[in-house]
Amino acid sequence: MSKISVVYWSQSGNTAAMAEAVAKGVTDAGKEAEIVFVSSASIDELKSETAFALGCPAMGVEVLEEGEMEPFVTELEGCVAGKTIGLFGSYGWGDGEWMRDWVDRMTVAGATVVGGEGVICQDAPDDDAKTACEELGKKLAAV
């Protein structure tokens, strides 16, 4: 059975809850999901996967978390060409600029972002956001 990694960073638990929902979608579609906090994630493992998910909330002035997730994404940019990636995350304020920027970065690096956009929600994911995350997982599993 092929595996789909769901790599995320979360401070409040909101993006972690979204990661759980993405993984549920993957397993509901018949594939194995591995949820990994970014500090334990391996770029080499992601290189061997056709599809994977990345999650991070908006931080500061709508940017990725700068201590762990941003350096990970920067390193990953060099090896995402030809990969299918699902992006997700929560925010407290703003309009989703951090996600649009992230989608653009991955697209320019040669990845296909599922649906052409990330799944976002304000604060804790409600039922609609959880459903959207599950659908993201199912789409990744279909790759």
Set out the residue ranges of the language-model regions.
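FMN-binding flavodoxin-like domain, especially the glycine-rich phosphate-binding loop
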Residues: 3-4, 14-17, 21-38, 48-143
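Helix-turn-helix
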Residues: 41
